[in-house]
UniProtKB/Swiss-Prot annotation:
One Pfam short name: Cytochrom_B561
Record protein name field: Transmembrane ascorbate ferrireductase 1
Primary location: membrane
Subunit structure: Homodimer.
Lineage: Eukaryota, Viridiplantae, Streptophyta, Embryophyta, Tracheophyta
Requisite cofactors: heme b
Amino acid sequence: MAVRINAMAVTFVAHALAVIAAIMVLVWSISYRGGLAWEATNKNLIFNLHPVLMLIGFIILGGEAIISYKSLPLEKPVKKLIHLILHAIALALGIFGICAAFKNHNESHIPNLYSLHSWIGIGVISLYGFQWVYSFIVFFFPGGSTNLKSGLLPWHAMLGLFVYILAVGNAALGFLEKLTFLENGGLDKYGSEAFLINFTAIITILFGAFVVLTASAESPSPSPSVSNDDSVDFSYSAI
């Protein structure tokens, strides 16, 4: 059941938080951590791609995909296409971000998949990919019957929100893990970089909260030109 809040009323805050989070992670990675690179003698530059791609590419674009489906006053076929494409881009960038972490670890001779953050991350990206593939087949092409779509919709929405919330929580865990490593290496616990990392995590969590709120809010009224098949309410869709 939708919360009695119009989705348009909360999307502005979500978009603003997304911009702030993106700027903060870029400032951290470029100004404090030295920049971004796929090939570099300084392997830390390779790792810097990981938080940038996972936050901007995976968390923010994934959130914008959810928001777009709930807040855009467009016909449902158009919203479905935008929703699908944004999630595909988010998934691709998320995979690229994980590859950057593996590349950094391999070239720095650091073990892979030893932390809770990495375990949850692999689980999240796997569930996200599974959700996208089955959603493409059922809701987009070739598409299931109206009864099949209606029956799977609650599970589609519930799994989508679960995966997204898990992704946001794991992002916060990743910031904490990296900050702990840096502090163990001598970073000032009360320095500007430590505060920047912590506040980036907080903004990320707030963005995720507003995305979930948008997904639970009422959608704009559908256009009267939408066909009967598309009049089925897919507005609670999360992925």
